[in-house]
Amino acid sequence: MDKKQREDSQKHEKFIHYADGSSLEEINNTVAIPKNAGFWKTLMAFMGPGALVAVGYMDPGNWITSIAGGAQFAYTLISVILVSNLIAMLLQAMAARLGIVTGMDLAQMTRAKTGKKMGIFLWIVTELAIMATDIAEIIGSAIALELIFNIPLLWGVLITAFDVLLLLLLMKLGFRKIEAIVATLVAVILFVFLYEVILAQPNMGDVVRGFVPSPRIMTDKKMLFLALGIVGATVMPHNLYLHSSIAQARQYDRDDVAEKRKAIKFTVIDSNIQLTIAFVVNCLLLILGAAMFYGTNSDLGRFVDLFNALQNKEIVGSIASPMLSLLFAVALLASGQNSTITGTLSGQIVMEGFVRMKIPLWARRVITRGLSILPVIIFTVYYHGNEAQVENLLIYSQVFLSIALPVSMIPLTLFTSDEKIMGPFVNRPWVKYTAWFVTIVLTLLNIYLILQTVGLAA
């Protein structure tokens, strides 16, 4: 046994060990890219990471906001979803470029530039954000299980704890298979809502006019608050760490500028395609809300309310059916399961990057899910399985996402605008100034949303 094999053997024997290598070593540089292939074949080889990133833009937390936006204000807020998606494309492209150019993910680069104490602080903040995301997915999955299989909410919450078994299976299949499974679940969500929107028969003229920003958005207080909710949820902090890492999964020459440029090109195309799908899903949700519920005065602030409304002919008319409700619940479950993968990978990335500590992925999942599931169980037991009260926890958990947002966006913009770090791949002036404008605006919006959530804003 040579020295490297002995080191690898000792590494696997330890439960916790020092992470001083490449980002997510399990998947880094593992996906082959065909040599001298054409555009489409090369693009297919790079497709995948974007799907994992897009999951964060169509999570259950966004569903309620989008459907409520349509139900209350018809198609007016489609323009807000469009602007939000363009912002997401910009920031995710920057995150991927940072990873490909430097060979470090955002957490590693932040730790390298700030030091150990700041690294620990940023790790704690980011872990809270990941837990907040996990809480939302636990609630979404548990409610979906209750709606589909009539499983009591508490049992549904406990069942979600065993998704670590799913993760173990997926990691054995390889990263390319994981990407394919996530993309399939995204497709399920897309086609469920596309089918339901086709049945709803929206006025396409009104839909198209919704892409043009309306002055009412700034003058109507309720509309403005919902618009802020849509924009404020645009960037999931952990997505920037995730993308800066998994963009390095492809095999390319790390020292060749032309190879890096090629990797950036195809990675950004993949990201933009998948984020466009997320944009379509969010538009479909808003259109569904407008076509089925606008003018009905229905309370659609909860998943259960939506589920019941889709089979109520007094609300949605003749197209109401249990099948519509079932498909909605299936899409909700698919969204929750996607987080099993992305949440765990993000958690591992920030742990390795900020505190340079590495544990097995299955253990990482058990710890994150264990900490996230406790408040959900407490809420569920205390409120006797009342879905409305449990969903309030989802709303409160989003505050942590808002707090963590500047922690990821500010370093990302700083690093990608630094020529010493990025070399010829540094942000162009228009990208730099746009990114800073977006960072400041989103940070202020999230502060306002936090104040609104806790009842302090006017």
UniProtKB/Swiss-Prot annotation:
GO terms classed as biological process: iron ion transmembrane transport
GO cellular component: plasma membrane
GO molecular function: cadmium ion transmembrane transporter activity; manganese ion transmembrane transporter activity; metal ion binding; symporter activity
Keywords: Cell membrane, Ion transport, Membrane, Symport, Transmembrane, Transmembrane helix, Transport
Residue spans crossing the bilayer: 38-58, 86-106, 119-139, 151-171, 180-200, 223-243, 275-295, 315-335, 370-390, 395-415, 436-456
InterPro entries to which the protein is assigned, alphabetical: NRAMP_fam (IPR001046)
Pfam families: Nramp (PF01566)
Localization per Swiss-Prot or TrEMBL: Cell membrane
Membrane topology annotation: Multi-pass membrane protein
Family to which the UniProt record says this protein belongs: Belongs to the NRAMP family.
Alphabetical list of PANTHER family matching this protein: NATURAL RESISTANCE-ASSOCIATED MACROPHAGE PROTEIN 2, SOLUTE CARRIER PROTEIN FAMILY 11 MEMBER
Task performed by this protein: H(+)-stimulated, divalent metal cation uptake system.
Protein name in UniProt: Divalent metal cation transporter MntH
Species of provenance: Latilactobacillus sakei subsp. sakei (strain 23K) (Lactobacillus sakei subsp. sakei)
